[in-house]
């Protein structure tokens, strides 16, 4: 291992909750059976899916030396996953796939990538053996060397409902890999799609492990309540522009009320209002001007992500910058980032897909560490601070 592969975790280690330990133990037992079934982890956003899976990988690798390939749907999740593994699992070696495939495979090594990183028809047609040179080992060569060393191969797919379709390039890659261990995780499972994929891949029906919402709420990982205000674009006599401004105005008022409640309670936390807008050239700037002119928000309090493509560094910087009280972002960059200090989400983008709605509502479901520290489990969290508020302009 070279010094550049020693990852310094940026987050603190997590003490497992009882439900997390129970799920990890059950998945480990299933994978270590003589015929390991594919395992699906169903769990709400914020429940610790990455943490649970990392414990499974560590336990399985201790019994059967295994090289793991872990795929996520969004580029900003690669670094988050690497950090979580480094913080919580001394027995695992997280490394980016692009770099790790040029190293010697070893037990507990976890190669991290987006699904798109291996989802290329050109590579598939060449048996994933065409992008090498004197300095770069192909993925096929790397996997073959690992198997020759006696290592088992494990595949982890985060947000499996997105990529695991028999017709997608990533689905075809997963079929080619033919992993000994197969773990899928999702907050919005689509069983029919997963079953179809598994059948095409020659796998048996998966074994399911679930974290209930009650377990996650009682562990103070998710807020207990959701309050949604929906402005139906079909029923209103207001113009679309007026409805969008109403959404922003009401969401900002709610965020400011929460800010005052936190100050009164002595909780050192500045709430963040998330504003999701449609993709387009001027949608972010239009929302910014409405917040400044109609709501009186100081420009310095507003953080913006204007690109159509996610920028993980920028998103994380704004989400963690307590001088910012608003983060405006486009639909295309609206999933796969953490913002624990967010209580309120405003969407001026018409939403008509239930699965996508649940994905972005998950951005305001987490309970921040200052709230958990201010209200230990023996004390109830005040309902207003234990609620995720969602303001939507919708067309159902």
Model regions and ranges:
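Walker A/P-loop
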Residues: 34-56
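Conserved interdomain linker/interface between the two RecA-like ATPase lobes of SF2 helicase motors
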Residues: 205-305
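SF2 helicase catalytic motif II
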Residues: 123-183
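Post-DEXD/H (motif II) to motif III coupling segment of the RecA-like Helicase ATP-binding lobe
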Residues: 165-225
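Inter-Walker segment of RecA-like/P-loop motor cores
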Residues: 90-136
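Conserved Walker A/P-loop ATP-binding site and its immediately adjacent core
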Residues: 50-55, 64-89, 114-117, 278-280
């Amino acid at each position: 291992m070279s010094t550049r592969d020693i990852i310094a975790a940026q987050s603190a280690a997590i003490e497992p909750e009882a439900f997390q330990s129970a799920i990890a133990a059950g998945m480990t037992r299933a994978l270590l059976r003589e015929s390991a079934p594919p395992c699906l982890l169903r769990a709400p956003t914020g429940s610790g899916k990455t943490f649970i899976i990392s414990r499974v990988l560590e336990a399985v690798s201790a019994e059967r030396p295994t090289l793991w390939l872990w795929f996520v749907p969004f580029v900003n999740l690669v670094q988050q996953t690497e950090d979580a593994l480094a913080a919580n699992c001394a027995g695992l070696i997280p490394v980016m796939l692009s770099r790790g495939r040029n190293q010697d495979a070893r037990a507990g090594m976890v190669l991290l990538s987006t699904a798109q990183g291996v989802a290329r028809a050109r590579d598939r047609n060449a048996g994933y053996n065409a992008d090498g040179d004197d300095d770069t080992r192909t993925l096929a060569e790397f996997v073959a060397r690992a198997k020759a060393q006696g290592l088992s191969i494990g595949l982890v797919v985060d947000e499996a409902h997105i990529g695991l379709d028999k017709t997608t390039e990533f689905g075809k890659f997963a079929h080619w890999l033919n992993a000994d261990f197969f773990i899928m995780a999702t907050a919005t499972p689509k069983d029919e799609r997963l079953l179809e994929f598994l059948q095409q891949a020659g796998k048996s029906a998966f074994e399911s492990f679930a974290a209930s919402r009650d377990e996650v709420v009682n562990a103070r990982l998710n807020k207990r309540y959701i309050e949604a205000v929906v402005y139906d674009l079909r029923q209103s006599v207001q113009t679309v522009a007026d409805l969008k401004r109403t959404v922003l105005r009401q969401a900002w008022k709610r965020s400011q009320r929460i800010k005052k409640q936190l100050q009164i309670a002595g909780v050192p936390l500045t709430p963040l209002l998330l504003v999701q807008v449609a993709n387009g050239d001027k949608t972010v700037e239009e929302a910014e001007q409405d917040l400044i002119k109609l709501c009186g928000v100081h420009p310095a309090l507003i953080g913006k992500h204007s690109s159509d493509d996610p920028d993980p560094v920028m998103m994380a910087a704004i989400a963690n910058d307590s001088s910012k009280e608003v983060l405006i972002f486009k639909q295309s960059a609206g999933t796969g980032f953490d913002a624990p200090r967010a209580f309120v989400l405003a969407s001026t983008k018409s939403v008509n897909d239930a699965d996508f709605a649940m994905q972005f509502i998950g951005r305001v479901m987490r309970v921040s560490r200052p709230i958990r520290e201010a209200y230990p489990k023996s004390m109830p969290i005040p309902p207003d601070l234990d609620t995720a508020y969602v303001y939507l302009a919708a067309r159902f």
